[in-house]
């Protein structure tokens, strides 16, 4: 990778959210190192296991007291005991459930390897908990507690256990909970280690969230993820410098109170004396004959951001009537577009683009022809001007696909163009668009791939998914912890792209653009989707409903830099 762009050194790095147990997303090795630090300090291994088991048993007893779970509790509990410390945690849980009056049985598929786990096993048998001589019947109604393997899983659990777990889910879905990590699932990547893995209704994650458990590939196996707080001291957590940070609902509120970058402060309401041009100037290049609605959705998202001046370069057929639905949007240019050729970027006029704070390119613009082949010369002028633009460039959808198809006269094409760009860039791909732009990274786990992409091209990357990931070139990463599958509908990404671009335009107008703003925008967008999903009927989750809901959220604060004043148009 070449020298960093000049603007990159000015990016702020104040941590948001706090790097604490509520937000850190760790790998198994990081947690093992943390445990070694705690044990070296004098904390007995026995104390941590007891603490974990007691915390899970208290939480599980509360769950089993709920109406939907009471019958499972009445039918009894089967604890699947592994050979290591995860099995020991399960035995503490089994003991406490037994002492609470529940009928608990034990089954261990492998010989016990850890002395502490063996001690808990002997004690459980002494208390009278029965050991099953054969694997439990997967069709029976008892609740299964999966304590076979936790974060240390490196290989498949074996055909016998895998088939048992598969049959359990087929015959009794929703009747298994997992301790720390479902057996057969990698806690680092979220991928299955073999042919099958436990499918949990709830996964009780001990101490810190394991990064693999919130990846898209893991969601069907993890079920509802609950972090069990173990009261870990803050000091050793500060040493986990390379962790991604999880973002939840409370973090949208805490963003407004965040101290912000040095030399500036974060404000909610805009400066009362600021003109519309000092509240962010954004150009949206979107839409085509085939995807006409994308322009409307992107502009609706941008409008919800609170940016002061919104311009559009869209198909001429849309431009003529835009005033009837979005009267505040200034039509900068009506562009030619056909069903098969997409939006004509060769005719895009960017004179005076230096006066803008941000440009969004891509939602619904289509491809140059239906076979997804590209004519490098057709868009060359637009890419040249956008490369020289010193403001924020947000690339989404077919903007990314067209970039990936350009020659750019470099051996690594699009990536070299991104590195040469004069201003900051935000990329918002879904997995397919990411694979086209970064084919060499497409098979990596999402957290690893997004960071490698950001560092290779110098852009901030928002990799969209059920739990979207935001990665900055300086190494910071965030991942959304909350999402609603009901709002995964066509057009939602257009709203997000417009909203994020508007937030970025406001920030740049105030002189304090940062990758954390893209993370905050993605979080608020996801929460708006969750909010509208509670409305009755499918219409409540339409993308325009999300955009309307975004408009009612408090504006994402923008950093104020008194030294910068933006000129008018």
What are these regions (language model features)?
Residues 2-110, 213-394, 401-426, 431-569:
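Small-residue (G/A/S/T)-rich helix-start motifs and N-terminal tracts that mark the onset
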Residues 116, 160, 196, 491, ...:
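Short acidic-hydrophobic sequence patches enriched in Asp/Glu that either
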Residues 92-171, 320, 324-336, 345-351, ...:
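N-terminal small/polar loop signature for handling phosphorylated ligands or for N-terminal nucleophile
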Residues 181, 206-208, 363, 397, ...:
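Residues immediately flanking
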Residues 141-143, 148-249:
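Internal gly/pro-rich beta-alpha loop/helix module
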